[in-house]
Design a protein with these regions (language model features):
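Flexible, compositionally biased loop and terminal segments
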Residues: 1-264
């Protein structure tokens, strides 16, 4: 996606000491950046606040990262908002999250419209409370004709469930004679995932220092570069994003082949 140079320079002006924004190669920005937004609860607990306050603070960080990615010309930003396992959290926390999802989508619609952001959901949103689901569906309709960056929000998402769902759909089509089992390949499986039509993430960012995938995009991250920061999600900002992209740009992406040095 093309970036607006004036808006880019303005948004990333006055970089803090130690942040090398001028070193960023704007011709090598990942097309798809994915964020595992972790640490909201611990951020709140460390400040003597209720865990739900961390989720509220995390929304502000997501807003900043959305804007930063638009400014950088990122094609797709995906974010892990609520997993299929998160239903096991205390009911009060789940209720607050569902309310926050609905309220945030309404509150952020002006931003999404102003920045021409298209929204898609990864996961089974039919299982969400009716009020939250209705807000999501209305928001999707209002953003449907947007042609800028795609924001893919993983809500009630689990990668194993996603892959199982895809396999089941393919099996049903094969049993009905709609497809030849011999024709089943990577592309066919990918076309049955929630991310169908989206490029795989080149860069996956996980906050809070945890070194695990947490059942997230297991198929799609086969060749992704990972960046882990100890920063909790509510403290992750545009400058943290710049650091992550700089780290990505310093990697030698081999896709199972030889490095550039080895090829030489």
């Amino acid at each position: 996606m093309q970036y607006d140079e004036h808006k880019l320079v303005e948004y990333f002006a006055d970089a803090p000491a130690g942040v090398g924004f001028s070193d960023l190669d704007l011709n090598n920005i990942p097309h798809h950046i994915s964020c595992i937004m972790d640490g909201n609860g611990r951020w709140a607990t460390s400040r003597g606040l209720a865990r739900t306050e961390g989720h509220k603070a995390g929304i502000l960080s997501l807003r900043e990262i959305i804007t930063a990615c638009v400014r950088l010309g990122v094609d797709v930003l995906s974010a892990y908002a609520f997993s299929t396992e998160n239903w096991n959290r205390p009911q009060h926390e789940v209720n607050v999250l569902m309310h926050l999802f609905a309220k945030t989508f309404i509150d952020e619609l002006p931003l999404l419209k102003r920045e021409n952001v298209r929204v898609v959901f990864l996961g089974d949103i039919s299982a969400l409370p009716m009020k939250t689901r209705d807000v999501f569906e209305r928001g999707l309709a209002e953003c449907a004709d947007h042609t800028g960056m795609t924001l893919a929000l993983a809500v009630n998402y689990g990668a194993r469930a996603e892959i199982t769902r895809a396999v089941r759909q393919i099996a049903l089509d094969a049993a009905a004679g709609k497809i030849d089992p011999a024709a089943i390949d990577d592309d066919m499986v990918a076309s049955h995932l929630y991310t169908a039509g989206l490029p795989d993430p080149e860069l996956v960012i996980r906050t809070s220092g945890e070194l695990r995938l947490s059942n997230y995009l297991l198929w799609q991250v086969a060749y992704s570069e990972f960046y882990v920061t100890d920063t909790y999600w509510p403290d992750f900002d545009r400058w943290g994003l710049v650091d992550a992209i700089l780290a990505y740009q310093g990697r030698d992406r081999r896709f199972g082949g030889l490095s550039k040095t080895e090829e030489a």
